[in-house]
Amino acid sequence: MSSSITMSEPRLNWDVTPKNGLKAFFSPENYKDHSMAPSLKELYILSNRRIGENLSVSASSVENEPAVSSATQAKEKVGMILLPKPRVPYPRFSRFSQREQRTYVDLLAKYAKLPSSSKTVGTNTNEYLQYLDMKKHVNEEVNEFLKFLQNSAKKCAQDYNMLSDEARLFTEQLLRACIEQVKKYPEFYTLHEVTSLMGFFPFKTEMGLKLEKTLLVLGSAKFVKTAFPSMPVKLQLSKEDMSSIETPQQKAEVMHCDISKDPNAEKLVSRYHPQIALTSQALFTLLNNHGPSYKEQWEIPVCVEMIAVEGSKPVKVIYINSPLPRKQMTMRERNQIFHEVPLKHIISKNTSVPVSAVFMDKPEEYTSEVDMPTEAGECRKIETLENLDMDFDGDVTELETFGVTTTSPPRSPSSESDSSAPLMTDVHAVPKIAAVPLAPATPVAPTMPVAPATPVTPTMPMAPATPEASATPNITDDSRSLCQILMKQLQKEKQLFSGVEGGPEGCKNKDDQGLEPCGEEVPSANAKSLTQDNEVHRTEGISKESDVGVLCTNDERQGGQGNANNPNNTATASEAAESEKGIPCGSDTDEDCLIIDTESRSCDGKTADLGSRPNSSAQASAGNQATTTVSEESCVLKKPIKRVYKKFDPVGEILKMQDELLKPVSRKVPELPLTNSEESKQPPASEQPSAALDAAPWPKSSWPSAFQKPKGRLPYELQDYVEDTSEYIAPQEGNFVYKLFSLQDLLLLVRCSIQRVETRPRSKKRKKIRRQFPVYVLPKVEYQGCYGVEALTESELCRFWTESLLHSNCSFYVGHIDAFTSKLFMLEEIASEELKEKLAALKISSLFNILQHILKKLCSLQEGSYLLSHAAEDSSLLIYKTSDGKVTRTAYNLHKAHCDLPGVPSSLSVPWVPLDPSYLLPYHIHHGRVPCTFPPKPLRPAAQAKVGGTRMPTRNHRNPVSMETKSSCLPVQQVENEGVARNKRKIM
């Protein structure tokens, strides 16, 4: 009996392989994780609970509720902010203490999002300087921590290959539906051309995609939901939700809706004639090419068509469709495709609004290229005649020795050494047309000869000769002629600038009013010249620099009608002046004809014509013309006084004071008219006025901007034309927005959409006025939620940048999703200022040059179907063309290349993304832990360490991760499983 019992019982086997504590089942850590006893922190919370806190609860409600221990309730209360367990133990402690980390976390939460010019920074300067100093030291440890995370990702490479069954099923269905869409394109292609992405054109830094017009808006958009009761939020769809969202087949059809077969786009192309029509996804793909790696692989179908135009030859249009599915796709990208669907459903409200009511673009960014910044416009003030020291109502014909001597006393000692006193130039219209204005140039000194000038009007006398040429008779007539020339010149300048300020009608009215010439002889003893020093009056808002004798010439009228009183004297004076110097009449310091162009319309509504340099042939043939426009005059600086007034050039001052109103032109070329004002030489830098008030009223913006609108390239009838939405086909779900952009000399028709809409104040000043604005939410799947928030990649930044180009009024959000739990743990809003700082990491000028080169290359293609192909990590671009029934062995089979699901790239490197140390998660704030830093060294024993949220460092038998840094001061005891375990089985 006993023997049978002993035979049935199993025998004890003591030959157990020693595990040396590596896989010990009953360890202190397992005991703490699975123990039902409350921790010290939970006991502390229970002890501090107010007495009688829950006495008001009725007995019936207590009986109906399940029995839950107080310790469990405390665990639930504290468990939301427990410090997460790292994937790999930390190799060392932080160089900062717990107190220092807590201080920096508080400063980071206060100043991380504030600009340095904010009021908070100004009132707390010392605290802000402390934050900057601590940030400099923290960044040193951040670099070491990021290297630790990169090595941790290599040890945990299986984390990046994780894909749930639900996500795998959805992505397979979607990708197969996209593969079916590929079959609608031609099957065989032959290599047509190979080119570089960058091209061989000169690199242009100032380039941008600029909005010309929003052509058509169709459909509606749902409102966005950005506030949630608690975070994180589980991204899980119920059966009812699955029935309301679109299927993978429907999503694939929307993704590959070709613009070449869009009837709405065809109508718009036939009306506006853009060179290129493309989708927003194609635009993003062409912009998302970042050198020098160019790691993005893509294929884009292109269709080149010729459309008929009434009354003209056919026009070529290039249709760029959405890119085809990728040949290789990482698990991170598959995860993002899957989580994008539930994220859009959770952040969407049931209400929607028509897209036509959405403010998609900012009006203040649609400034023309010739418009000035607001700062320059505010600091320049229009001066009135009351603010000037000059008396324009005085009769200068009664002055003595007019044009011979200068008797005005100088204001400053510097002006006493000048050979002639400067004269103030007025650029504004004088209210009284009969008043005699001051000439824009002072009479020259007696020692300086003045070359003659051609008359301005048929009744004007010619300018007299200089004192050196006074041997000719009728000196009083010459003085009278100079007087009349100066009066008529200033009167014409008054009319010139009043035409700019008053419009075409004002110019016409003042041109019709003529002045009678002076008939009396002006005694030379009473002629005086009005002078003024070269002192700059900053309080009056205008620079009063010295001027020289500037005489207006007319190229069209010479001789017979120029001086009815003494034409011989005028001719003699001209010959004497020219023979004395032996050089022709020049203008300014560069011997160029200076043309005063006010960009105003002449009396008949036409644009003003530019004058030319006077010559002998013009003087002989232009005597028959009796009328001319104001804009045909040209102010000529006399060559003999060039060496004296080289420093004080009145024409240069006019150019700088009236930057765009008075445009200099290049030297006259016999073959080409003087129409290019950009080639004229500018005045020397020494003559630039120091005061900011001398700025032009409409200077051309020179700073590059991707959001700046140029001059309208559309005709006026197309700019004001409003499309009838009833003539177009609206989408069944979602919306379509058709916009016309310009890229240098190319017109682009872009079909885009608005993802979501939000209601917010129209501006900071108009907070009571609320409008609807577009919103774009980017899903971002992250694998390092236990350490912090991952930074935005180049592709994600390019996506935000592309959306900001399409809709400048768009708001941006990033939905941070934990890849392991499928929870939305953070919905971050990116402000416009913050986005501009982030976009500084992109080489925007390089991306624009790549886009322009590709589009220029497409414009050179002939009619047909093409395929743009770019391989990963390749700087070249392949252009394939459809085979016309000829299939060779080198032909590219598009259908065969996309016959199966995209594979996973076989790369040895892990798709690791660095963290952004400026983002604080709730556990960072609660525990006072600086993001992207090692844990601080505990100051107390293990019992107190758990109260602070961390356990005492215990001896770790696992191999630590290498740091690859210069630091070798690793602690003896490693941090073990900080925070809550992943598979914690504690009974709640």
Swiss-Prot record:
Tissue specificity comment: Expressed in brain, kidney, liver and testis.
Subcellular location: Nucleus
Phosphoserine modification, residue list: 322, 587
Record field: compositional bias (Basic and acidic residues): 534-547
Signal peptide extent: none
Biased amino acid composition, Low complexity: 413-422, 563-576, 615-629
GO cellular component term, pick one: cytosol
Residue(s) carrying Phosphothreonine: 589
Classification via Pfam families: NARG2_C (PF10505)
Region of interest: Disordered: 402-422, 500-587, 604-633, 673-706, 942-968
GO biological process: positive regulation of transcription by RNA polymerase III; snRNA transcription by RNA polymerase II; snRNA transcription by RNA polymerase III
InterPro entries: ICE2_C
Up-regulation conditions: Down-regulated during neuronal differentiation, probably by NMDA receptor.
Keyword terms: Nucleus, Phosphoprotein, Transcription, Transcription regulation
Keyword Iron among UniProt keywords: no
Summary of the function given for this chain in its UniProt record: Component of the little elongation complex (LEC), a complex required to regulate small nuclear RNA (snRNA) gene transcription by RNA polymerase II and III.
Family listed: Belongs to the ICE2 family.
Record's subunit section: Component of the little elongation complex (LEC), at least composed of ELL (ELL, ELL2 or ELL3), ZC3H8, ICE1 and ICE2. Interacts with ICE1 (via C-terminus domain). Interacts with ELL.
Record protein name field: Little elongation complex subunit 2
Lineage: Eukaryota, Metazoa, Chordata, Craniata, Vertebrata
Gene: Ice2
